[in-house]
């Protein structure tokens, strides 16, 4: 008799069923009892109980996709900053309140158990968090999708602060197992590296290339189910772990080489050991290229396996069934890898293979910074991926001859600029150029960014392919970034606009009509106050610093980079401190400046800025002369779970990058959605946030993109601003003293040098005066509680555009051409 298909209704648990399931897993899965179980055991038992729901729905999703032979998007990203999944999965399965009650009857707090979960920190910042939001939205909107990345053993480092300095520690996020992932040994892939290429006669008489690998690595897949909101679709994030093909040499071991016998195992496992190994050395560069190829090759093989399971070796439908999105340049090598598989392994002719590959790939550009558009030396490519270099040469030759020469005949300068190969003392492979040439669509991630991609970064490519370039403004999932992280505000919105807003964020716009309503303002600001009070306790526990929820909470949380200009925030705080020292009665509302940031291990100036922030904090926070009007807090080990505590409590959102440098930003969206007011430049998504909320509800300052170009074009001299502004000069000169580093003068001088002798490449000094005035405006607004509440409410209510569901729908309509697949 056929098994009856389970519906969503059949799968839904009540409180007693969930409680019984948790206790059962505590005993049978974890082998412990209620009396002696640790909080971690209770958390894992809860996850196991929830996984019964997750895997049932995952199986149903996969069976439906297979049966309907759906077109799917395969999202390749070196980063997936997933954070914690317990709360997220419970919300998406509509089980959060049920679980809270079930655990309450067992004498447990769900929020306490959620704290047992380590962050899945497989990313560095916005790039990885965007990928996580996108796969959430794909599942929520019922689109068939697979995320592909690397199963890093350590992910991003755990940041400790010692004497003000950043110290990197390994982040062993799965040291004791992760209940949300499952290993799939049946889908292991074998990946070749090194070796040489031989030209031989094929079976049909033509010439054929054979790559004889010098070494092979195994890619072991770990699947993390991605539960869409409502629990209908459960897609997967597949992460690849590297292992040796032959990880133990018995002969060497028996001959006494106990350590050498495991050398291959150690070398292979290094590939998926850490996110972004330091590439200052040749060995580091080689490891990073291998890391990128490893996950791309595993993913392409897996995509081929899935396709062949239905279509065999008939590739006529490949481009109609498969879409691959390259999230930045890290997965670029997937393009020559697919060509290698189609031409060398499947015997397809070049033109047919290129036609398929070109249709399949799309590329998202995330940066206008030249150093972030990766380049690899030709010699390194030749050593590690000899066949891929040949394929890149062929792609390049055909592109230059067939497209560039007819368009710009005899123009060698244009050819040199557009070529995938950069000529010079050290010849290099330009991965950004390869992405554009090998993809059918290229998108930027905010309107201003996409305009600059077309006009400044890739103008000739845009001229060749005007239809190729498009925009998809980034977004964030409101399920995590409002429903889960700010439950009080979520409940208020449920009462006012109904419970559909997590799927239709535009519904919040109807709240604007309450922006002047005194009763609603009181409710809204009471919730903000509660969130600030919670953060006060977190700050005390994490840093030992006492702050008051009465103060303005001014928050800058993002990775540390000069273009993001934490140094501008720093020197403004120093200026405020000088004003207070000069006049203890200086009229300002008490302010707490909160930073959360990690610097790349090899980025010395970024680490110096962290050190300066902490040294400033030590001095300011303990100076009784300023009567507690100014506090500085650096929250160590910034991560998704910490962001979920900081964002609901933020009054002011610092989005102060140099105009033209921040592609989009998503922290700006999250904080505005939670009722923070943006102080920012006209850069990235700030422009669109100001359009949605109204420029009068944001504190916009500084040079715009055109003014930045104009100033740089005229010849920017930071000394002009240094000598013209006595306050700015005094602040910068402070860095040379030992005021913040007693007995060690000049320890902070590198920051001043970067802003003066270093040419201040990100125009920090040029924007200082305008930034200072914008902060005075913030201060004035905050002193008028009704005005501030109105602006905060409008900011929150008008962020509907920045739902990642809208972003995904734009990708579907403009690039991927997917159809939703209803499950059940």
Q: Model-predicted segments: where are they?
A:
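A conserved ligand/cofactor-binding region detector
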Residues: 2-824
């Amino acid at each position: 008799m056929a098994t009856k298909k389970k519906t969503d209704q059949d799968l839904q648990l009540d409180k007693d069923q969930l409680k019984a399931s948790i206790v059962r897993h505590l005993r049978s899965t974890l082998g412990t009892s209620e009396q002696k179980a640790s909080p971690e055991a209770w958390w894992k038992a809860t996850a196991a109980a929830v996984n019964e729901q997750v895997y049932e729905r995952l199986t149903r999703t996969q069976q439906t996709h297979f049966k309907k032979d759906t077109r799917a998007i395969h999202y390749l990203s070196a980063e997936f900053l997933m954070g914690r999944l317990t709360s997220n999965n419970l919300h998406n399965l509509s089980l959060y309140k049920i679980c809270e009650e079930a655990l309450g009857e067992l004498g447990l707090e769900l929020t306490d158990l959620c704290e047992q979960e380590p962050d899945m920190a497989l990313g560095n910042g916005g790039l990885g968090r965007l990928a996580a939001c996108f796969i959430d939205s794909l599942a929520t909107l019922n689109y068939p999708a697979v995320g592909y990345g690397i199963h890093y053993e350590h992910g991003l480092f755990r940041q400790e602060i010692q004497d003000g300095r950043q110290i990197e520690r390994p982040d062993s996020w799965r040291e004791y197992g992760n209940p949300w992932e499952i290993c799939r040994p049946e889908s292991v892939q074998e990946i070749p590296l090194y070796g040489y290429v031989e030209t031989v006669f094929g079976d049909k008489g033509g010439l054929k290339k054979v790559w004889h690998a010098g070494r092979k690595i195994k890619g072991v897949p770990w699947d993390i189910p991605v539960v869409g909101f409502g629990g209908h679709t459960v897609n997967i994030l597949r992460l690849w772990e590297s292992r040796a093909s032959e990880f133990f040499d018995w002969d060497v071991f028996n001959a006494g080489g106990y350590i050498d016998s495991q050398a291959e195992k150690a070398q292979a496992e290094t590939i998926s050991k850490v996110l972004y190994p330091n590439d200052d050395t040749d060995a580091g560069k080689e490891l990073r290229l291998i890391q990128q190829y490893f996950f791309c090759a595993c993913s392409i093989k897996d995509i081929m396996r899935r396709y062949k399971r239905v279509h065999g070796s008939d590739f006529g439908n490949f481009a109609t069934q498969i879409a691959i999105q390259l999230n930045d340049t890290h997965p670029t090598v997937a393009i020559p890898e697919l060509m290698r598989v189609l031409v060398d392994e499947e015997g397809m002719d070049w033109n047919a293979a290129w036609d398929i590959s070109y249709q399949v790939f799309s590329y998202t550009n995330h940066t206008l910074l030249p150093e972030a558009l990766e380049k690899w030396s030709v010699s390194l490519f030749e050593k590690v991926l000899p066949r891929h270099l040949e394929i890149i040469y062929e792609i390049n030759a055909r592109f230059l001859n067939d497209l560039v020469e007819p368009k710009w005949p005899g123009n060698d300068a244009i050819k040199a600029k557009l070529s995938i190969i950069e000529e010079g003392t050290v010849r290099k492979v330009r991965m950004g150029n390869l992405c554009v040439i090998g993809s059918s669509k290229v998108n930027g991630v905010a309107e201003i960014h996409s305009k600059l991609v077309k006009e400044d970064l890739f103008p000739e490519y845009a001229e060749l392919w005007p239809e190729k370039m498009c925009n998809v403004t980034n977004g964030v999932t409101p399920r995590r970034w409002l429903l889960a992280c700010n439950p009080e505000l979520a409940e208020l919105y449920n009462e006012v606009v109904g419970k559909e807003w997590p799927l239709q964020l535009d519904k919040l716009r109807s709240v604007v009509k309450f922006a002047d309503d005194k009763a609603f303002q009181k409710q809204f600001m009471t919730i903000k106050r509660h969130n600030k009070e919670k953060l006060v306790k977190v700050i005390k526990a994490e840093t030992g610093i006492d702050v008051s929820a009465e103060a303005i909470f001014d928050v800058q949380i993002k990775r540390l980079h000069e273009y993001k200009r934490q140094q501008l925030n720093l020197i403004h705080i120093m200026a405020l401190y000088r004003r207070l020292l000069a006049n203890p009665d200086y009229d300002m509302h008490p302010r707490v400046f909160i930073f959360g940031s990690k610097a790349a291990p090899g980025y010395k100036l970024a680490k110096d800025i962290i050190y300066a922030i902490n040294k400033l904090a030590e001095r300011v926070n303990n100076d009784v002369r300023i009567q507690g009007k100014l506090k500085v807090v650096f929250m160590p080990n910034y991560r998704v779970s910490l962001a979920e505590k900081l964002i609901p409590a933020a009054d002011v959102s610092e989005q102060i990058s140099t105009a033209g440098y921040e592609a989009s930003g998503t922290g700006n969206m999250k904080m505005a959605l939670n009722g923070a007011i943006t102080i920012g430049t006209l850069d990235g998504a700030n422009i669109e946030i100001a359009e949605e909320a109204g420029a009068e509800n944001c504190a916009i300052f500084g040079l715009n993109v055109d003014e930045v170009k104009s100033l740089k074009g005229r010849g920017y001299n930071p000394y002009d601003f240094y000598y013209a502004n006595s306050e700015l000069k005094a602040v910068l000169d402070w860095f040379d003293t030992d005021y913040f580093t007693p007995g060690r003068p000049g320890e902070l001088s590198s920051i001043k040098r970067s802003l003066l002798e270093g040419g201040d490449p990100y125009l920090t000094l040029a924007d200082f005066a305008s930034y200072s005035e914008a902060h005075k405006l913030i201060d004035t607004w905050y002193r008028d509680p009704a005005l501030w509440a109105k602006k905060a409410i409008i900011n929150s209510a008008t962020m509907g555009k920045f739902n990642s569901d809208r972003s995904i729908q734009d990708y579907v309509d403009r690039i991927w051409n997917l159809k939703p697949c209803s499950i059940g």
